[in-house]
Amino acid sequence: MVSDFHGSIEAAHKTAAKAKKTEADAIIVCGDITHFGSVEIAEKILAPLTALVLPVLFVAGNCDPSQLAEAQIKGAVNLHEQCHGLGTVSFMGLGASPSSRFYSWFEMSETKILNALMQTADRCSEGRSLVVVSHTPPKGTKVDRTFSAIHAGSASLRTFIEKRKPNIVFCGHIHEAKGIDRIGDTIIVNPGPVKHGNCAISDLDDKIEVRLESV
C-alpha cells in the first residue's frame, strides 16, 4: 500500500519491484499520484503497477486533477465513491481532501465527504471485511498531525469510522504523519509518501497485520 507519488516515476518502479518481491496480492494507492498533473500523467505513473497484472486499486488526491476521480485507467480500479470486492474483503474509496484555505485541485466539503462515505458503504457487500482507501486521514489521530501540530484530517471520515467501524483505513496526504493508529478497533495506516521511499505491507486475512516498510 502506497500514497503520494507526486509525479515520481522512480517511486512507481520501486513500488512495482516491491510488489513483486513480496508477492503482493494487490496494490493500493491512496492518491496524489501526480503533482498537479494530468490524467495522462497519472496513467503513466500507474503503468509500472498495472503491468504486473495484479489488482491495482486507487483514489485521486488533492494534488491530482478532479477529472481523475472519474477516469478509467486500464488495468486499475478507480475506487472513488465505489466499492470493489477482492476475496473476502470489500474495498471502498474516497479521493480528495477536505476543503481548505490552500484551494488545491481536488477538495470536498465535510458534508459531501460524509454523504459519499455513507452511500458508498451501503453498496458494499455485507459479511466481508471492510477496508477504506482514502487520500485524507481521519481527524484527531497520530496520522493527521502536521509539523505545526494541527490535526488536518477529515472530521467526517472520523465520524464514518466511529459509526461504521471498518476493519482498516489506508490513507496518506499528511506526509510528516507517517504511522499506524486506531480509532476504536479500526486500524488507521498512513505509510508516508512513497516519493520518499515509504510503503506499508498489510495482511488482510484472518488476523489483520500491518507493517511500515521501504520500497
Question: How would you name each of these model-derived features?
Answer:
Residues 15, 44-48, 116, 153-160, ...:
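A general structural detector for well-ordered alpha-helical segments in enzyme core domains, enriched
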Residues 20, 64-156, 214:
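Conserved catalytic scaffold of divalent metal-dependent phosphoesterases
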Residues 71, 84-87, 108, 155-164, ...:
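Binuclear metal-dependent phosphoesterase catalytic core
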